Design a protein with these regions (language model features):
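Hydrophobic residues in well-ordered beta-strands that form the structural core
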Residues: 161, 183, 255, 423-425
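N-terminal small-domain helix-loop-helix segment of the aminotransferase-like
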Residues: 31-140, 200, 348-350, 462-463
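Helix C-cap/helix->beta junction micro-motif
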Residues: 248-249, 379, 419, 463
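Conserved PLP-binding catalytic core of the aspartate aminotransferase-like
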Residues: 365-366, 379-418, 443
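Eukaryotic N-terminal targeting leaders
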Residues: 1-39, 196-198, 465-477
């Protein structure tokens, strides 16, 4: 088990060296650590981590720092925080802290909070009854993913995830559990997924063949809907077909609905032409209820839909009694503060407020999304039409010099150093095409987002002018 963890960390550290061309200076001071610790000390959480903190320290301000940076690379939704903050402040002043808060409760989360969460999920996300006894609560989505992977899979097992996918899945499933990520490639060009994810049973069969040929067990399939980074939504028909395949082959299917309420209004007049079909989000919970299988599970968290990543609340929903029992016995180090659970219990059971909040947040998300895709259309930059999440997946491959990870990172760095706009680099998402980037659009104000799009436009136009001049020069020589 330890050997698999060490191997997984070593692969990540070597990959970081390949991508950045250097190791952290901290490598010289890790002799006091275990081999695992030394590798972790030299292996950043994500490749854009340092750049993000640099950008935040030099953040744009219209008057105080008009040439400052605009970080659009971390998945945070700040558009509706002012509304939520006012509500939370009213709870803390008007409600009396419950007697259960200062003591120990269930390691899967207090029953009071799980009841509130089940009520919220049933009313707003799943649209079918959620049993609080089948919920487990941990300190954030990362903890839920770590715990689930640790319990369901052994070190060296494979978890297939359709590419492109959230890069930090590798750490979430691998750092402690030793589970290895398999990038399930279903397409190359972004145009191939303009109507949504392209996953089929044939893709799963191909993945199983490759995984087993490598001497591994295909143990988990992880789907995110709405997807990160493409914003695509899996239809219920696709989810049902995939679920049947997974049950037959004893592969655990986990559907991550982290962005399930962060939906785009595809009828908005500025974007409606992008959508040929009206594909609505439907929760995987209804399929779980119908099939009642120990191989089907759902992840959720309050981080994105409510914009409270710092509160650290993630949820597992499953009909697998053994999984939930194991979770209870292992979750001590991942539990959520009782005070946080108490506070959010009151928030999630205020039906009028939450209904209004979700609707207004979706309206703001749609307006911000329209700003980004409006700019992309004017610039003739290809992108995947999003139906949900906090992202736009864009194609800047026309500006690539070469077709390597180094060239990918060079373009990302050039955009940031030239314009101050920091996107999420495509390196690490597992797809085959280079030159793709993720734009996080609700992490800044609408004014700041407009400035970022203006700067992106200036960068694109300057690059095209230089490319045109270079082409003309080549023709004359």
């Amino acid at each position: 088990f330890v050997r698999h963890i060490h191997s997984n960390l070593k692969k990540r550290a070597d990959l970081f060296t390949l991508r950045s061309g250097r190791r952290s200076l901290r490598a010289m001071t890790t002799s006091s650590l275990s081999s695992r610790g030394a590798l972790a000390a030299n292996n950043p959480l994500r490749i854009d981590h340092a750049a993000y903190h640099e950008a935040v320290a030099n953040a744009y301000h219209p008057t105080e720092n008009p040439t400052g940076a605009l970080p659009l690379n971390v998945a945070e939704n700040r558009l509706s925080w002012s509304d939520l903050r006012a509500k939370i402040e009213s709870i803390t002043t008007e409600e009396t802290i419950a007697a259960w808060v200062p003591g120990y409760t269930s390691m899967r989360g207090s029953l009071e909070f799980r009841r509130a969460a089940a009520h919220f999920l049933t009313r707003h996300l799943t649209r079918c009854p959620v049993d609080p006894e089948q919920l487990a609560v941990s300190a954030g989505a990362t903890s839920v993913i770590e715990m689930t992977s640790f319990i369901l899979a052994d070190a060296g097992d494979a978890a297939a995830i359709p590419a492109p996918c959230y890069p930090v899945y590798s750490q979430d499933i691998g750092s402690f559990s030793g589970v290895e990520r398999y990038d399930l490639v279903t397409h190359h060009e972004v145009s191939e997924i303009s109507d949504g994810p392209a996953l089929t049973v044939s893709h799963l069969e191909h993945a199983r063949t490759e995984i087993e040929a490598a001497g591994q067990r295909f143990r988990m399939l992880i789907l995110t809907t709405p997807d990160n980074p493409t914003g695509g939504i899996y239809s219920l028909d696709t989810l049902s077909e995939v679920a049947d395949w997974c049950i037959t082959h004893e592969v655990h299917l986990v559907v991550n609905e982290l962005y399930g309420l962060s939906l785009i209004d595809t009828r908005h007049p500025e974007i409606e032409a992008d959508y040929a079909d009206d594909v609505a989000f439907n929760s995987f919970a209804s399929i779980m209820a119908d099939k009642q299988s120990e191989y089907l599970h759902l992840w959720y968290a309050l981080s994105k839909d409510l914009g409270i990543s710092g509160f650290r609340v993630g949820l597992l929903y499953s009909h697998n009694a053994a999984l939930l029992e194991a979770y209870e016995n292992l979750n001590l180090s991942h539990t959520v503060s009782n005070h946080t659970q108490w506070l959010l219990q009151h928030l999630l059971t205020d039906d009028d407020f939450m209904t209004s909040y979700v609707a207004e947040n979706q309206r703001r998300l749609t307006e911000a999304y329209a700003v980004v895709v409006g700019a992309l259309k004017r610039l003739d930059i290809p992108y995947v039409p999003s139906r949900g999440s906090l992202f736009v997946w864009i194609d800047l491959s026309e500006f690539m010099v070469g077709d390597s990870e180094q060239a990918d990172l060079a373009l990302w760095q050039e955009l940031y150093r030239t314009s101050g706009v920091l996107l999420t680099p495509g390196v690490g998402f597992g797809h085959t095409k280079k030159g793709l980037f993720r734009v996080v659009y609700p992490c800044v104000s609408m004014e700041e987002l407009s400035v970022a799009m203006e700067r992106l436009g200036a960068f694109v136009q300057a690059k095209r002018q230089r490319q045109g001049s270079s082409t003309s020069g080549d023709a004359r020589s």
